[in-house]
Amino acid sequence: MMATQTLSIDSYPDGQQMQVVTELKTEQDPNCSEPDVEGVSPPPVGSQTPMDADKQAIYRHPLFPLLALLFEKCEQSTQGSEGTTSASFDVDIENFVRKQEKEGKPFFCEDPETDNLMVKAIQVLRIHLLELEKVNELCKDFCSRYIACLKTKMNSETLLSGEPGSPYSPVQSQQIQSAITGTLSPQGIVVPASALQQGNVTMATVAGGTVYQPVTVVTPQGQVVTQALSPGTIRIQNSQLQLQLNQDLSILHQDDGSSKNKRGVLPKHATNVMRSWLFQHIGHPYPTEDEKKQIAAQTNLTLLQVNNWFINARRRILQPMLDSSCSETPKTKKKTAQNRPVQRFWPDSIASGAAQPAASELTVSEGAVVTITAPVSMNVDSLQSLSSDGATLAVQQVMMAEQSEDDSVDSTGDGGAALAPGHLGGLVLENSDSLQ
């Protein structure tokens, strides 16, 4: 794009408004007459067209310099970031009006149609200039907001990342702490030379709160410079200084503490309290809401943290314990089941004659005979009467328990005396009226 030159009202004096049209006609038509000394060549009357006549009327109009100036400002607004403001065009309009009044020139011509066209063209360019100004302001506002957002994000990332150069990094905190600790030495204060250039006042305190000299300054090159301060010029309490020091150190280490809390690792004291409650109530490890509140008050945790811990503990602590106990001692459970109180499943009339300490046989309805090698002690007081189905189930359980213990023993017996079905020791379980 060709660079446009800044135009002003004086760029279009009288007698030169038709120069552009003349030059264009000269390039297109070599037979056209050369321009005169003033740069205006009157075209032949017979060769003019209606369009050429309209162009000449526009170029000769008194408002044409103002229209050209406004068009130039619109082009300048679109070419660079620093656009032309509408206020500057208002000043140009005032200057144009003063010049026209000073020279006694009219603002309009004899053709009302041309006057209306020029006024509307100036209004359109004026609106266009205002819109360009708004767009320029929006662009500047967006750029400023975007840059501010980037700066904020970069600063926050620098603080959170804990880089060595950031002021809140652990290395920087240790350096600050050591530097502050060094300032409390009775021999003097060791500070960088840049601190004095910034106008910072550094002081050394000893017991009593009085400032004493000397003040030792160490330059970055390692040179030691001593500066004297008169005793008693500044007084400060050691307690206040120590309190301020503790506050500064707590602020510096605040990020470390917050990061530890964000990890989700509960304090050891809290886990010990909740673990103790869990094993004390292992039979029913489900705390009530009141118990949760009490535990939360003891451990300084929230109800949500306490609830989540117990959910995880039941799944990760108690469940593996139960699984391991079930897999290691399967036979122990069978033996402990026999130690339960023996429940009799036949009437008292049969049990009174069946309680004999001898080997006996149990005859089932199918006719199968099973020999019980170990005598079973019976207590008449604990006998209970049930249906034949319950008795059959109890007999099957006893048979299975005895068979698992004596797998190597033959069920027919080695020389054992088998009792007759009608013997009192043989218990015949039938669906009779006495069992109901």
From Swiss-Prot:
GO MF term (any one): DNA-binding transcription factor activity, RNA polymerase II-specific
DNA-binding region: 259-321
Subcellular location: Nucleus
SUPFAM superfamilies tied to this protein: Homeodomain-like (SSF46689)
GO biological process, one term: camera-type eye development
Phosphoserine modifications at: 33, 41
Predominant place of localization: nucleus
Residue ranges occupied by any MEIS N-terminal domain in the UniProt entry: 80-163
Region (Disordered): 24-49, 401-436
Alphabetical keyword list: Activator, DNA-binding, Homeobox, Nucleus, Phosphoprotein, Transcription, Transcription regulation
A UniProt-annotated Pfam family: Homeobox_KN
Functional summary from the UniProt entry: Activates transcription in the presence of PBX1A and HOXA1.
Family: Belongs to the TALE/MEIS homeobox family.
Quaternary structure (record): Interacts with MN1.
Protein's name in the database: Homeobox protein PKNOX1
Gene it is expressed from: PKNOX1
